[in-house]
Design a protein with these regions (language model features):
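A basic/glycine-biased coupling hinge at the interface between accessory DNA-binding modules
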Residues: 2-11, 15-16, 33-36, 41-44, ...
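Conserved helicase C-terminal RecA-like lobe
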Residues: 10, 172, 176, 360, ...
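N-terminal pre-P-loop "Q-motif" helix
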Residues: 18-32
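Conserved phosphate/pyrophosphate-binding and hydrolysis machinery centered on Walker-type P-loop NTPases
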Residues: 22, 71, 98, 123-127, ...
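Conserved helicase motor core of SF1/SF2 NTP-dependent helicases
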Residues: 44, 232, 236-315, 319-324, ...
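Helicase P-loop NTPase motor core
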Residues: 44-50, 113, 285-288, 293-387, ...
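Short alpha-helix plus adjacent loop in nuclease-associated cores
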Residues: 104-112, 263-270, 297-298, 391-413, ...
């Protein structure tokens, strides 16, 4: 239900809203009309400026919160912005559109993706799902899997989608290049599998939304009319399709505020286009530029070192960070000949600090850029008997047991996802062989249906034999869960799946430590589900799965 906005009931004095900001921050927060580029150096208080700008729009300018959109790059940043705005304004913060690019696109597509030929009940595939499709495509095209590996191929497809190049266009651009021609075939097969499964990948969320807005003037105008004031954080990290999305939505009122720092652009390998921020004034005529150069996080010695390094960039917007935090300690720079020499010296320095009583091991941390760099440090820690803990590892949602239960939930929610059905049909083991699954897949293909639909018609398929009863048992169990899903929340449904399928019993057959770890992960998953339902009124299983998909692959 849309909130009725009556700003005159509680409007604050402008000085109350902006009094905690420095003069330049105030300038940025109070500039509300037309395109605005806020060049925000590291530690310069950009989130503070954005949240106060939103509060200023509502309380001073009388803008309806419903008409404000703030785009972030992570769910964590979106939640932080929501919380801060909620503390600043007395009413209406819940109506502000604060979300990531991907969450925003899901929100739009859930309403209108049927205009593009999809069912609104679509599934969002994660990286593992994508790799499975690539392997299938490579096999069906009879290509060498060693020459056409999933990771690089997904990179090619993602790069194409980020540049809004769809399969047919990619094929045209391939020309006579043999490798590109094969990649075009894989891309085409990959996209067909997604469409057949009523599924999208993360790049599709953006690409399909842009296509939807371009092809449907009524939808575009509706969002332009609603989202009259748009703010985008980390603008230096936007790619071509994200730029086009923002350009389209801001096309009527032109009240676009972007915050970023070209000096912090490090995601070119993910498709980020630095020209989006460098050419902002040319792209949006009449744009104002405000520079936030006062740093609140570091000392001047650190900032001068950073300024000296970044000054070597050939193409950048001039800015010079400074601080009132004093000079601080001098920055040391040490060059090592080898990775092992570096690790040896770093571990020796840590041991010296500990032996002198200045620190404990738990006070020390080693940061590295790539996972491969950890090996040298780990080996030196072991050699010198230094206790350590490696932070990171497997993403929670990529763990086998979590993927299994997610596949159950997806199958219960929608039987159109063949990957999920294939994953769980023998989890726990049901004795359904690959030959049987192949026959089901052939039947499904010949009759233009999904795998689960073929399973429902198993009695009509010749050559299945005794396996038919096992298939019917699986189908019946899913149908029971579907009925339960109408009455239970996701946490309760997970509990039923674990108990009724015998999944927990299978875990108990594993080694004690391994079984316990998996059980704890499943309990944590149930807790996450319970928390989601507690914080979202009228939440449905589809909503929870959407939340998991966005959190798992974005953050």
């Amino acid at each position: 239900m849309r909130t009725v906005f009556l700003p005159f009931l509680w409007r604050k004095n402008v000085s109350d809203i902006l009094q905690s900001l420095n003069p330049v921050q105030k300038e940025a927060a109070s500039c509300t009309e037309g395109p605005l580029l806020i060049l925000a150096g590291a530690g310069s208080g950009k989130t503070r400026v954005l949240t106060h700008r939103i509060a200023y729009l509502i309380d001073e300018k009388g803008v309806n919160p419903w008409n404000i959109m703030a785009i972030t790059f992570t769910n964590k940043a979106a939640q932080e912005m929501r919380d801060r705005v909620d503390r600043l304004v007395e009413f209406g913060a819940e109506s502000i559109w604060v979300a990531t690019f991907h969450s925003s696109c899901v929100r739009i597509l859930r309403r209108y993706i049927d205009r593009l030929g999809y069912d609104n009940h679509f599934t969002i595939y994660d990286t593992d799902d994508q790799k499975s499709i690539i392997r299938k495509a490579v096999k069906e095209l009879d290509l060498d899997p060693k020459q056409y590996r999933e990771g690089p191929l997904l990179g090619v497809i993602s790069a194409a989608k980020n540049e809004m190049i769809e399969p047919q266009d990619f094929e045209t651009q391939a020309g006579g290049d043999f490798r590109m021609c094969q990649e075009a075939k894989i891309y085409k097969a990959y996209q067909k599998t997604l469409i057949d499964n009523n599924a999208v990948d993360f790049d599709d969320l953006l690409l399909l939304t842009v296509r939807l807005l371009r092809e449907n003037r009524d939808i575009l105008e509706a969002y332009q009319e609603r989202l009259r004031y748009i703010m985008v954080d980390e603008y230096q990290d936007t790619n071509s399709v994200q730029f086009e999305l923002i350009r389209l939505i801001s096309g009527k009122y032109h009240n676009l505020c972007v915050v970023g720092d070209d000096d912090q652009s490090i995601y070119k390998f993910r498709g980020a286009d630095i020209t989006n921020i460098l050419s902002f004034e040319e792209t949006f005529p009449g744009a104002k530029v405000v520079k936030l150069e006062q740093n609140y996080r570091s000392t001047n010695n650190i900032l001068e070192a950073a300024n000296a390094v970044i000054a070597n960039n050939a193409h950048r917007k001039e800015k010079h960070l400074w601080s009132e935090n004093g000079e601080g300690k001098e920055v040391s720079f040490i060059h090592y000949e080898t990775a092992y020499g570096e690790a040896e010296d770093v571990i020796d320095k840590i041991q010296t600090e500990v032996h002198m009583g200045k620190h404990q091991y738990q006070d020390c941390a080693i940061l590295y850029r790539t996972n491969a760099q950890s090996r040298a440090f780990e080996e030196k820690c072991i050699k010198k008997s230094v206790p350590y803990r490696l932070v990171g590892g497997v993403n929670f949602y990529q763990r086998q047991e979590i993927k299994d239960i997610l596949a159950y939930l997806k199958t219960i929610d929608s039987g159109r996802d063949d990957l999920s059905v294939t994953r769980i049909v023998n989890v726990p083991k049901r004795g359904i062989g690959q030959v049987t699954l192949n026959k089901l897949a052939v039947y499904a293909s010949e009759h233009g249906m999904r795998l689960f639909q073929a399973m429902e018609q198993v009695e009509q398929i010749s050559g299945i034999g005794k396996a038919a009863d096992k298939i019917k048992g699986f189908v019946n169990q899913i149908m029971v869960f579907r009925a339960l899903a109408k009455e239970l929340d996701a946490a309760e449904l997970i509990e039923s799946i674990l108990e009724q399928t015998g999944y927990l019993e299978e875990l108990e057959k594993l080694e004690e430590d391994k079984a316990q770890a998996k059980q704890e992960n499943l309990e944590e998953f149930q807790n996450k589900a319970a928390d989601y339902y507690a914080n979202h009124d009228e939440a449905a299983l589809t909503d929870f799965l959407e939340e998991v998909a966005l959190v798992a692959d974005i953050d």
